[in-house]
Amino acid sequence: MKYEIDKKRLVIRVVPEREEDLYFIYLLIDKGDIIRGWTVREYKPDGVKEGERIKMYLAIKAEALEYHKFRGSLRVRGPVIEVQEGVEGVKGRRHTFDISIGREIEIEKNEDKPLEVVDEILNMAKNVMPRILLISIDDEEAAFAYITSIGVNVLHVVRNDAERSRGDSLLHDYLVTIGKIAEDLKRRLNPDKVVVTGPHIVVEQIGNYVRGDRVAQSVGGLAGIYEFMRAGLYDGLKTEMGIKAYERLMQLLATERNLVAIGLEEVEMAVAAGRVEILLIVDSYIKEDPHRAWDLIYKVYATRGKIYIIREDLEIGTSLKAMGGVASILRW
């Protein structure tokens, strides 16, 4: 993601470069922020019978956000408060900004907040892990998943339903099908890396049909996707997604309860004392109570703590949500 921050004007200019960037922009936009940029909307000047859709530069005051994780869609709705010169009758009406890849927008924050932490969060987008197309396969089932720093999306599950009596052609036809699906997904998703995982024998055989890194594990199919994520075979991915920090939190919760804070009240007390080493916060909580959530994030950043924003739809996000949406590992 390309971005610039004007700390005096509280303005952030961003250009999303990949779908994951839209998620981080979604996190940064709060209700009341002003969003500026080029957009297309219907315009009907006075005296004209029929309007037409034209490109114009305008600003809205954000009232609602709609983000779809793997659809690559981020929309911001609100009333128009500024419009380019020469365009009449648009100001005051409602408009929806479709924030898309490659298009610059400007976000003006509605409160005087320290923008250093905004810079830190935007850096998360710049340092995202490679996008992985994971093919988890055994002789009965193949599952395809798209893994990015913002989550795991299971795309397809294919059963090997060929007749067992067909012998050697059974596996060949199955692997040909898997290879065709893999090529289609590679063209559509343009992943940075393809990883094939499953029992060693099948992984070696699929290598003739799909090019990619091979990782042997005990099971394939849908169960193999979850084993891959749990096993730490790509430790860097687990670190970026906050999984390792969560695992450490749970270990300390069982062995040294005094070194963790669970829930908003405990975490706020720990933050006030400067004790927080790592903060884990669920993304949905940031939208539910943005004032308190950002206050925590800013204070942890100011005391050089590490911040992980966890997606609620991840397994660890569901667990953190049950803890109150926020937890932390303490320095002492």
Curated annotation (Swiss-Prot):
Cellular location(s): Cytoplasm
Chief place where the protein resides: cytoplasm
InterPro entries in alphabetical order: eFR1_2_sf, eRF1_1_Pelota, eRF1_3, Pelota/DOM34_N, Pelota_arc, Ribosomal_eL30-like_sf, Transl-rel_pelota
Gene Ontology annotations for the cellular component aspect, listed alphabetically: cytoplasm
Superkingdom as given in the UniProt entry: Archaea
Keywords from the named record: Cytoplasm, Endonuclease, Hydrolase, Metal-binding, Nuclease
Entry's Gene Ontology molecular function annotations: endonuclease activity; metal ion binding
Enzyme class: hydrolase
EC number: 3.1.-.-
SUPFAM superfamilies on file: Dom34/Pelota N-terminal domain-like (SSF159065), L30e-like (SSF55315), Translational machinery components (SSF53137)
Cofactor: a divalent metal cation
GO terms (BP aspect): nonfunctional rRNA decay; nuclear-transcribed mRNA catabolic process, no-go decay; nuclear-transcribed mRNA catabolic process, non-stop decay; ribosome disassembly; RNA surveillance
Family designation: Belongs to the eukaryotic release factor 1 family. Pelota subfamily.
Function: May function in recognizing stalled ribosomes, interact with stem-loop structures in stalled mRNA molecules, and effect endonucleolytic cleavage of the mRNA. May play a role in the release non-functional ribosomes and degradation of damaged mRNAs. Has endoribonuclease activity.
Subunit note: Monomer.
Domain notes: The N-terminal domain has the RNA-binding Sm fold. It harbors the endoribonuclease activity.
Name of the protein this chain belongs to: Protein pelota homolog
Organism in which the protein naturally occurs: Pyrobaculum aerophilum (strain ATCC 51768 / DSM 7523 / JCM 9630 / CIP 104966 / NBRC 100827 / IM2)
